[in-house]
């Protein structure tokens, strides 16, 4: 990762390599022994990142508030800039009972330089909380949604139903994780989310589970950037039925509404 970051890295926006830690999936708010085990894991992983020359550290996808606090504590000991993002489950509260916005407030108070949300939620169910977090905090805010159409009834992708006429149901009990394809947002939905966030002053933006180059490109365009992949953006003027290019025969255009 460091070698890739150093490729063509110059100017006022150099590439950065980030070290990463995330939810341990063993943290138990009622079992202090797991807290010590997780701290050891975080310390070891952060140490590896520092040894390899990380420019910054990211802690992400935490659904226990206290685990997020511990991750931030470990990262801050390095002196590197720290990003910390949470991923509350469908109950719309952290699993140890702390509110979503309150968790973010506490992370800011503890020194988080970028605080926000990532994963589990698509644009429709992440944006309302991102707006609240932006209003409540002064630090930089992060927003990295998944790429699926989550709803108020199903705010995360773990129990998202397929109501699109699926003829071959998933062998699992849920569409997660291997049958979410029909619920994916399109490029315009993702671009709209990113533009709304950027207009709110949120400048740490990305795409989480389900990300693809097209959606990353739309994110870049939403904040006014032109990137190498911009040349692949659709050019509908050349479409054989829906285009406006004078070379397109009229009888082909007429067929577009058939």
Q: What are these regions, as identified by a protein language model?
A:
Residues 2-258:
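Domain-level signal for soluble alpha/beta catalytic cores
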């Amino acid at each position: 990762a460091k070698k890739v970051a150093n490729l063509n890295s110059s100017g006022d926006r150099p590439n950065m390599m980030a070290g990463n830690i995330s939810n341990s999936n063993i943290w138990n708010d009622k079992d202090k022994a797991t807290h010590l085990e997780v701290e050891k894991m975080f310390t070891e992983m952060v140490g590896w990142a520092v040894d390899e020359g990380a420019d910054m550290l990211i802690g992400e996808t935490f659904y226990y508030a206290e685990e997020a606090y511990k991750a931030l504590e470990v990262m801050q000991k390095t002196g590197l800039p720290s990003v910390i993002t949470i991923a509350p489950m469908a109950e719309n509260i952290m699993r140890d009972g702390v509110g979503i916005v309150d968790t973010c407030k506490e992370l800011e108070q503890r020194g988080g330089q970028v605080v926000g949300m990532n994963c589990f939620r698509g644009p429709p169910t992440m944006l309302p909380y991102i707006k609240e977090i932006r209003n409540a905090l002064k630090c930089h805010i992060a927003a990295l949604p998944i790429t699926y159409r989550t709803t108020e009834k199903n705010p995360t992708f773990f129990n998202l139903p397929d109501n699109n006429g699926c003829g071959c149901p998933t062998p699992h009990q849920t569409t997660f994780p291997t049958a979410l394809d029909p619920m994916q947002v399109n490029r315009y939905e993702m671009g709209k989310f990113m533009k709304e966030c950027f207009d709110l002053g949120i400048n740490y933006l990305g795409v989480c589970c389900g990300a693809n180059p097209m959606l990353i490109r739309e994110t870049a365009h939403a904040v006014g950037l032109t990137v190498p992949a911009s040349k692949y953006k659709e050019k509908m003027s050349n479409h054989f039925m829906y285009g406006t290019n004078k070379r397109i025969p009229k009888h082909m255009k007429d067929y577009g509404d058939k």
